[in-house]
Amino acid sequence: GEIFLELIQKFYDIETVVISGKGKWFDNADVVTTFLIARKRNPNTPINQNRTISFCTLKESINEITDVKQLSENILLETDNQFVAVQNYSVNEITNFETIGVPWCGYFANLNWLTEVSEKLIDCNQIFKFTRGERRGWNPLFYPASGHNIEAEYIRPVLKNLRGTSGLYCSADGEAFCCSRSIEELEQLNHTGALQWIRSFENQNNETGVPLTQSLLRANMFWYEMKTDNMADFVANVNYDKSLFIATFVNRSFIDQRMIGLSLKAEFQTEDRVLLLALLNSILSMFFIESFGFGRGLGALDLRATKFERDFKILDFQSLSDGQKQAITDAFQPISQRNRLPLEQEIEQADRTNFERVLLEIFGIAEHYDAIKASLLHLYKIRFAVKD
C-alpha cells in the first residue's frame, strides 16, 4: 500500500478518496470498496504541500441514495452532509501523519487532535523487543501432543492463539519442543525422551514427499531445532475482530506464528507490568491498532507485523511521578480484572470512561478524549460496514 501510494502520487495528484461506511457496493465482494479521484500531474514538478485531499465516508448504503448526482456534487465540493462525512487534509498534514505512523486508512476520521497528542507518545520499539512465533513447518514435531515423555528441559510453554483469552491476562495453552543439543549430546546425557521423539520423525516426509531431515534444515540449526528467542511478556493478535487489545502473560511464554510478541528490553524489566498493560490497552492504543490494520474481509482486521513494530506507540510514561503511575494503575484495575467486551460496548463502560479520563488528564490531553473516541469508532465502523 505504501509503495502504491508513493508511486501513484508521482504521476497523479490524488484529490478525493471515497469509502463506504454503510455496506459493501458489490455483492460478490467481502471487502469494502474504496475509489480514488486523481488528476494527472507532471512528475518533474514539485508537489504542492498546501494542496488538500478529501477523504469521504458514505453514511448511507449506496442503494438507498436516490440522488446520486447530488451525492457526487457533495463529494466534489467536499461538502459534509447527511449522506457523506468529509475530512480534508493538506499534503503537508498527511506527511506529518505518516511520520507519526498513521496510514491513509486512518484519514477518514477526524485527526485534528493527533499532532498535539503525538508529542506525548513514545515508540514501543524503544521499550519492547518485538518477536514473532517461528514457522518451522511441521507442527506435530514442534508442538507435541500430551503423553510425549520428552524431558522437561526441552519443553517450553506456548500460546497457540488468543481465542480462549477472555480478559487481558493469558496463559500458555500448549507445549513446544525446543532442543538445541546434538544427537550425540542427548545420547551422552541419556535423554531418551527427546531422542525417541526426534527419531520418531527421522524417516517421515512432508506433504510434498521431501524428508523432514531435509525440509526442516535451517542455517546453523539442527533439523529438529526451534529457537526460544521469542519468549514474550505481552502479546498482540495478527487478526483482530470486535475486541482490540494486547494481553499480558501470567508467566512469560513462547508464541505461535499467528501472534506478535512484545518482550521488555533489559532497561525496562523493573517497570510496573500493570502500568504497561494499561497504556497498551488505552483508547489511544486501540486507535493505532485499528488504523494500522486493513480489512481482510467480512470485518476482520489484519495487522502487518513490520508496520506494528515500526510505528506502534503508547503514551510516554518515563517522566511520570510514582503518584501519577499509581493513579493510572488504580483506575485500570477494574478493567484488568474483568472480561473484555466488543469495542462499541467496551468504550461505554463506566470503568473504561473513568480510566481514560484519568489517563489523559495526567498527560494533559483530556480535552481530546471525545475526538479520539470518535475517530476510533469511525474507523471501526468502516471496517464492519461490509456486514451491513
Q: Language-model features: where?
A:
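Extended amphipathic alpha-helical segments enriched in small hydrophobics
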Residues: 3, 309-370
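Non-globular, low-complexity intrinsically disordered regions
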Residues: 313, 372, 381-388
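Polybasic, glycine- and aromatic-enriched phosphate-binding surface used to engage nucleic acids
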Residues: 95-98, 102-330, 334, 340
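A generic secondary-structure signal for well-formed alpha-helical elements
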Residues: 11-16, 40-44, 205, 284-288, ...
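Signature of N6-adenine DNA methyltransferases within the class I
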Residues: 1-136, 257
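Short linear loop/turn motifs
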Residues: 327-328, 373-381
